[in-house]
Amino acid sequence: VKKQCKIPFLLAAAMVLVAVVGSVIGWKLIRAGSYRDLLTVETGDFASEVQEISFDQIPMLDRDSATKLGNRKLGELADMVSQFEVDDDYTQINYKGRPVRVTALRYGDWIKWFNNRSSGLPAYLIIDMVTQNVEVVRLDSGIRYTTAEHFGRNLGRYLRFHYPTYIFDDPAFEIDEDGNPYWVCPRITNTIGLFGGTDVLGAVLVNAVTGETAYYEVGAIPTWVDHVYN
C-alpha cells in the first residue's frame, strides 16, 4: 500500500518541481536580456511612415459606451430580444476604413439555446466609433461557432479537436471586408523558460458560420485581420 501511495506522490512532486523551475528560469528579473530581445528595434521616420487621419476617422466611443449602445439596439428588435443577448466581445477593428466595434450575439439561456441551436445566432452588431451608429447585420445562415456555444460547437472545444497540439491566446471576433464573421485565434508559444516570453507563431481563422478553419503563419495572415497580438 505504501508503495502504491508513494508513486503518485512522487509524480505530483515532480510536476510541482518542474512547474517551479520552469517559472523561475523565466523570471523577468534574471532573464531581462531575453525579454528585451523579443522585439527587434528598428530606426524609422515617424512623419513619413505614419499617415495622418482626418477628424472623422478618430474614434470617440469607448468600450463601455459601445456596450450600452449595443444592448439598447438589441432591445429595439422584437424578434431577437426575447431569445438572445449581446455577447461581451466588442472587438475594435478597422472596417472599410472606419474604426468600429463588432460583437456577436449569444443565447439567453439553455432553453433558448436548445430552441435556436439548429439555426444558430441570426446576426451580429457593428458599432461605428465615430458616428455612434449601430448596425444589425442579419445573416442568411446563422453563427454556429462561438465562445458561448455548448458541446462540439463551443469554440474552445472545436479548436482543441482540430488543433490538439496548438496553444492559443484569447480569440477575437472579427469580420472581413465582405462582412463575413470570423474568430481570429492566435497561436502562441513560450520562448523563455516554460511559461515566459510569449510569442505569436500564427493564427487560426475560424468561419463563425460554417466552422471552416485555416491556419496562417505570421507573415501570411490576411491584411483585414486586426487582432493577432494582444
Identify the residue ranges that each predicted region occupies.
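Soluble extracytoplasmic regions of secretory-pathway and membrane proteins
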Residues: 2-230
